[in-house]
Structure formats: C-alpha cells, structure tokens
Design a protein with these regions (language model features):
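Conserved phosphoryl-transfer catalytic core
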Residues: 92, 102-130, 241-253
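Activation segment
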Residues: 92-95, 203, 227, 254-255
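Active-site catalytic microenvironments for nucleophilic, acid-base chemistry
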Residues: 53-54, 76, 98-99, 119, ...
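Accessory N-terminal region flanking or inserted into the helicase ATPase core
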Residues: 2-24, 32-35, 46, 126-219, ...
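Conserved helicase motor core of SF1/SF2 NTP-dependent helicases
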Residues: 36-47, 57, 65-68, 86, ...
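P-loop NTPase Walker
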Residues: 2-103
Length: 255
C-alpha cells in the first residue's frame, strides 16, 4: 500500500489498477513495457504521467506519429530539459543530418518520382510508347508505391518486394519491381535531397550511428503504426540499460 500511495503522489492523480501496474513496472521493474489498449482508454495520458516517475538525470525520447500529436504533447508535458519530444521522421532527419555532416538537409517529396520521370528509359526495356496514358501513369505510380513500401519495410530483394505487391494488391504492368530496387540504389547514393521516407530508411540502410541520439527511456505513442524502418530507427537510439515504453492498439494499425 505504501508503494501505491507514493506512486499516486508522484503522478498527481488516482490511477486505475492497470495504470498502477504500469507505473510499478516503470519504477521497480526491468526491461521494456508494451501497453495495449483500445482507442480513448488513456494510453497517451498514461505515458505522460509515467514521465513523472523517471529521474531528471535520465534522458528521455518521446516519439509520436505526427506533428500535430507532437504539438499536443509539448503543450501537455511542457518544457522539460531531459525530455525530447519529436516524430520518428524528425529523429531520422536529425540522424541523417549529423551523419552526413550537413547543417541542413534539402527536403524534396518529389525526389523519386521526378528522377523516374526523367530517367525511366534508362531503367527499362519496355516499349513505353506502347503504353496508353492511363497505363503509363499507373506504371509510374506502381514504381513509386513500391519504392515507398520497400523502404518502409526495409525490403531490398525481388522476393521481399513481391510479397509487398501481394500485400498491397499492386497490379503490375511489367518490370516495376526491378526498377524500384534500382532506383532505391540511386536514392542511397544521392542524399543531397531527401524525402520523408528517406528520413527513416537511410539511417538503417546506410548503417548510420546515433551520434548523440541515445536515450535511457524511449516512449512510443500509437506504436502500432510504426513501420519496420521506424522501429529499427528507434532501436538505434538505445544504449546499455535503455528501456522502451510503447503504447498502441493493434486494431487501429495502418501498416
């Protein structure tokens, strides 16, 4: 009872029995914590309250799925010196920036599509003139989709790409898989510009180092939506004894 009372005092509200279990594991347990609960059950609030239980000399990363959630978290948590609140993409951007030794990275969401449109004839033996306008645009879209899906899933073989084709019901016209894999090689070598998927893909595929982005505690909100590339990026941020506290709802997963 004494331990429960102390937790209530520290988190400054009366938690449910489930939250008490989480908070006790935070303070007295070891290893990682996964909180699975339905939408509206207070997962994010539980994570925020859990921050109060961590000593101020511990470095904390709190990752959210998008910028709007980050802004909300910043309002609720306030400015706490040892807590770094950001999206996973923002984390990846910073890691790429530091590893490439540049003060600013140019962001171009059209990086891959523009390259494909300008260089497609060098990647394919297909007679592009034989494709009608609708088929041609679908062909381009298929390549771009595959490049995105492959990067998010850290897929770099034909077999892995084909699995993604089936999973996402992509109706192939011809050699889209081969082109996607080749364009990804170009993307690895051309890092003057990055798109948002590059931010979480490049740190993994180029074996980048965390360079100051290592934390004692790593929180992940809406963790069911993290892609393989995003999860692997977060794993780069651990150090000896780091703990991961993830919250999510598998029934809401978009991946």
């Amino acid at each position: 009872m004494g331990r429960k009372k102390k937790i209530i005092e520290e988190v400054e509200f009366t938690p449910s029995k489930y939250q008490i279990n989480i908070f006790e594991q935070m303070q007295h347990g070891v290893g990682n914590i996964v909180i699975e609960a339905a939408a509206g059950s207070g997962k994010t609030s539980t994570l925020i309250k859990a921050l109060k239980l961590i000593p101020s000399d511990k470095k904390i990363l709190f990752c959210a799925f998008n910028k709007d959630i980050v802004k909300e978290l910043q309002k609720k948590i306030g400015k706490v010196e040892n807590v770094d609140i950001r999206t996973v993409h923002s984390l990846g951007y910073l890691m790429v920036q530091r590893n490439l030794g540049t003060s600013q990275l140019a962001i171009n969401e059209n990086k891959y599509r523009a390259h494909i449109l300008n260089n497609l004839k060098y990647y394919t033996d297909l007679n592009l003139w034989s494709l009608g306008k609708v088929q041609y645009l679908k062909y381009i879209d298929n390549i771009c989709k595959l490049i995105d899906f492959c990067r998010y899933n850290l897929a770099d073989t034909e077999k892995q790409a084909l699995e993604l084709v089936y999973r996402h019901d992509i109706d192939l016209i011809g050699d889209e898989i081969n082109i996607a894999l080749e364009v990804m090689k170009w993307g690895m070598e051309n890092t003057d510009e990055v798109d948002y998927t590059d931010m979480v893909w490049l740190p993994n595929i180029l074996y980048m180092k965390p360079l100051g982005l290592q934390y004692d505690f790593i929180f992940g909100d809406e963790a069911q939506d993290f892609s393989i590339a995003q999860r692997e990026l977060l794993l780069k941020c651990q150090k000896m004894g780091s703990r991961y506290i993830f919250a999510g709802d598998k029934n809401q997963s978009i991946n």
